Regions:
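Conserved acidic residues
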Residues: 30, 96, 126
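Short, glycine/charge-rich flexible loops or terminal/linker lids adjacent to PRPP-binding catalytic cores
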Residues: 52-98, 164-166
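Short glycine-rich phosphate-binding loop at a beta-alpha junction
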Residues: 29-36
C-alpha cells in the first residue's frame, strides 16, 4: 500500500466530484445515493463537493437498519446473483432531490435499482453521475430511454480480447 497511490486516487475522486458538482449545480441536489460498496468512495467525494449527505443502499437488510426500508431486487451480472437492496425510509423522503452516483455503468441493473428506491420514496431523481460507462453494454441506453439524465465522465466503446480499450 502506497500513500502516493492513495493520494492519487483521492485527487481523482475529487476531480470527478467537481465535474458532477458543476454538471448538477442547478438541480438543487439534497442527497446522493449509491450502492455498496465500490461506489461509496466517489459518492463521498461528490457529497463533500456538493455539501450534501451521502446514502448507500445496502445489498441486504442488516440489524443496524431499524424500521422501514425501501427495497428492490438487483441482479449482479458480475457475481451472478440477486441482491435485495435496501435503504432506510428515515433517510430518503419525497422532499429530496437525489443524485445517483456509481463507479461503473454496464448493464444498468444497479442504477435501475437505485432509481426504483428513489421512486418508492417519492423523491426526485435529478440524474446519475457515473465514473466509467461501458457503452458497448445496454445499461446506459436503456436508462436514457427511460428519461434518466446520465453524466458519464469516461465512456468505453469497446474492450478487446487483447486488453485494448477504446
Amino acid at each position: 500500500w502506497s500513500s502516493d497511490v492513495c493520494s492519487s486516487d483521492l485527487n481523482l475522486f475529487l476531480e470527478l466530484a467537481q465535474q458532477w458538482h458543476d454538471a448538477f449545480a442547478a438541480d438543487n441536489v439534497t442527497k446522493i445515493l449509491t450502492i455498496e460498496a465500490s461506489g461509496i468512495a466517489i459518492a463521498a467525494a461528490a457529497g463533500m463537493s456538493m455539501g450534501v449527505p451521502v446514502l448507500f443502499a445496502k445489498k441486504h437488510k442488516t440489524s443496524n437498519v431499524d424500521g422501514g426500508v425501501y427495497s428492490t431486487v438487483v441482479h449482479s451480472f458480475t457475481h451472478g446473483e440477486d441482491y435485495h437492496v435496501v435503504v432506510s425510509r428515515d433517510y430518503l423522503s419525497c422532499d429530496d432531490c437525489v443524485l445517483l452516483v456509481d463507479d461503473f455503468l454496464a448493464n444498468g441493473a444497479a442504477l435501475a435499482g437505485l432509481c426504483d428506491l428513489v421512486e418508492q420514496s417519492g423523491a426526485t431523481i435529478v440524474g446519475a453521475g457515473i465514473a466509467v460507462e461501458k457503452c458497448f453494454q445496454p445499461g446506459g441506453q436503456r436508462l436514457r430511454e427511460r428519461g434518466l439524465r446520465i453524466d458519464s465522465l469516461a465512456m468505453v466503446k469497446s474492450m478487446g480480447d487483447d486488453g485494448s480499450i477504446e
